[in-house]
């Protein structure tokens, strides 16, 4: 019996596609991309396969390749082309920081399908990131019209609005939605955080606290259901391991000695070009504000919260931080080169690029091994204000400590312990920026910061809020305003509620 060549080809393609799907489920995205490329090498006309290849390429950190693959899928007549345009828009906005091209792609998606809710949500979010409040609000309203009972849309519309009176209709809508949401934890969290923010804005502090408590409880249940929890003992052991991997003795030890954490040859790291400016500190400590100030300088380009350093840790330094107790020149050089290639892709030709990932304070020792001349900006603020600001935000499950004030307090104290160690080891290379001092005496503090970074004075740094570039953090609206003191001492509105944690948060500062 003769075999049907068409059936054989189809079976071969299906086998490879099944393998790629299994590789994706296993999280092996490079392997999945390789298998999909093998499929397309034999059957290049498969639009869906080009689409899936684009998804894998983006996950592999290849945004330009992903854009090209999405374009090929569109050329081949992909079903649901609005999804490809949406994904191209996300790449332009999140990976390449090209807001104009992102908006074009999102508008193309909406031209194909005016009722495509994800495109309206992403367009609204893009307007938020650009500081275009009214455009963001209108886009969220359009999205809400498509799905009036969508909790996330109502919450985001509230967050993009200026709430200045207690009878604002949005507050009533949030109360009603929260009362009818039932036990859907994610929805209750979204609505509760938005209601808390609105009530706080109009001075209804007691009800705001209750709304935030409901929101954090729901967020915590959602995190636990996803397997995310904050382990205080495990985090303390992690800080212990970081301190052991980069001991104070290594900073002053003579070359050739073998103290853990000392690079065998500190001359191997390539000269940074462009030069990274690392900005880190506790989340919600003013790091976005400092980045916005620096990005107003003509020699500095904004990098945002780059994933580069955590990716390098994952690839080159496992188990971390134990692997850093014995660093070799070749590994450090490879890591530094990979990092520099990553920031060059984001801003080719830039002289300085900011890397504002707050939790990079864990990696200060590794940063100094990769870039011995690096200056690291460390932002900090009043711990009570800091803790409250964290508790008031709906954060990713990766920050599992953020839903419980006891966990937040523990995390802050461990962060303070680690920063005291880094100050001992690298006292000349850490530039501390105190939020309260910055808003009280902005020109003095900005001049001090620029001097420490060996950058010339630039008056535009005091008018940072005039920039129209993308800002993709929870502080998106605050950094669009001139410096103000409204957030200083905010904890006093909730002094009674914060009393159980007050002593722990006010002792042993950085």
Which residue stretches match the model-derived regions?
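Residue-level recognition of tetratricopeptide repeat
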Residues: 12, 46, 80-81, 116, ...
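TPR alpha-solenoid repeat register
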Residues: 15, 49, 83-84, 119, ...
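Structural signature of tandem alpha-helical TPR/SEL1-like repeats
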Residues: 25-38, 60-72, 83, 94-108, ...
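A structural motif in tetratricopeptide-repeat
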Residues: 43, 77-78, 96, 113, ...
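PAPS-dependent sulfotransferases, especially Golgi type II membrane carbohydrate sulfotransferases
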Residues: 139, 158, 171-182, 192-273, ...
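Phosphate-binding active sites in nucleotide-utilizing proteins
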Residues: 261, 267-369
């Amino acid at each position: 019996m003769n075999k049907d060549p068409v059936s054989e080809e189809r079976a071969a393609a299906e086998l490879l596609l099944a393998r790629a799907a299994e590789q994706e489920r296993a999280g092996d995205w490079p392997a999945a991309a390789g298998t999909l490329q093998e499929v397309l090498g034999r059957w290049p006309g498969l639009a869906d396969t080009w689409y899936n290849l684009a998804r894998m390429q983006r996950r592999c950190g290849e945004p330009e390749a992903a854009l090209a693959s999405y374009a090929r899928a569109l050329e081949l007549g992909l079903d649901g082309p609005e999804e490809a345009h949406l994904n191209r828009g996300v790449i332009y906005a999140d990976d390449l920081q090209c807001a104009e091209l992102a908006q074009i792609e999102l508008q193309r998606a909406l031209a194909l399908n005016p009722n495509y809710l994800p495109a309206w949500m992403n367009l609204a979010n893009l307007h938020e990131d650009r500081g275009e409040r009214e455009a963001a609000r209108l886009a969220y309203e359009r999205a809400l019209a498509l799905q009036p009972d969508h909790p996330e849309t109502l919450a985001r519309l509230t967050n993009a609005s200026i709430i200045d009176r207690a009878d604002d209709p949005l507050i009533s809508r949030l109360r009603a939605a929260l009362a009818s949401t039932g036990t859907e934890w994610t929805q209750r969290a979204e609505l509760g955080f938005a209601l808390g923010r609105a009530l706080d804005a109009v001075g209804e502090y007691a009800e705001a606290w209750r709304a935030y408590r409901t929101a954090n409880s729901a967020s915590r249940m959602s995190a636990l259901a996803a397997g995310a929890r904050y382990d205080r003992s495990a985090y303390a052991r992690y800080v212990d391991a970081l301190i052991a991997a980069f001991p104070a003795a290594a900073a002053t030890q003579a070359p050739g000695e073998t103290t853990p954490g000392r690079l065998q040859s500190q001359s191997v790291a390539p000269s940074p070009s462009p030069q990274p400016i690392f900005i880190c500190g506790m989340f919600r400590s003013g790091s976005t504000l400092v980045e916005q100030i620096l990005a107003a300088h003509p020699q500095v380009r904004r990098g945002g919260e780059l994933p580069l350093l955590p990716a390098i840790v994952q690839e080159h330094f496992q188990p971390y931080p134990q692997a850093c107790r014995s660093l070799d020149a070749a590994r450090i050089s490879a890591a530094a080169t990979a990092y520099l290639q990553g920031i060059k892709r984001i801003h080719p030709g830039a002289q300085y690029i900011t890397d504002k990932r707050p939790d990079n304070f864990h990696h200060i020792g590794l940063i100094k091994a990769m870039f011995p001349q690096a200056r690291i900006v460390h932002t900090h603020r009043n711990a009570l204000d800091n803790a409250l600001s964290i508790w008031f935000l709906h954060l990713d499950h990766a920050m599992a400590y953020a839903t419980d004030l006891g966990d937040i307090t523990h995390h802050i104290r461990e962060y303070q312990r680690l920063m005291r160690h880094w100050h001992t080891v690298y006292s000349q290379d850490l530039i501390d920026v105190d939020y309260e001092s910055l808003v009280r005496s902005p020109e003095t503090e900005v001049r001090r910061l620029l001097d420490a970074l060996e950058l010339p004075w630039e008056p535009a740094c005091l008018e940072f809020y005039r920039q129209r570039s993308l800002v993709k953090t929870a502080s998106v609206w605050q950094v669009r305003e001139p410096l103000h003191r409204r957030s200083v001492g905010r904890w006093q509105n909730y002094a009674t509620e914060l009393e159980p944690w007050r002593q722990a948060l006010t002792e042993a500062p950085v």
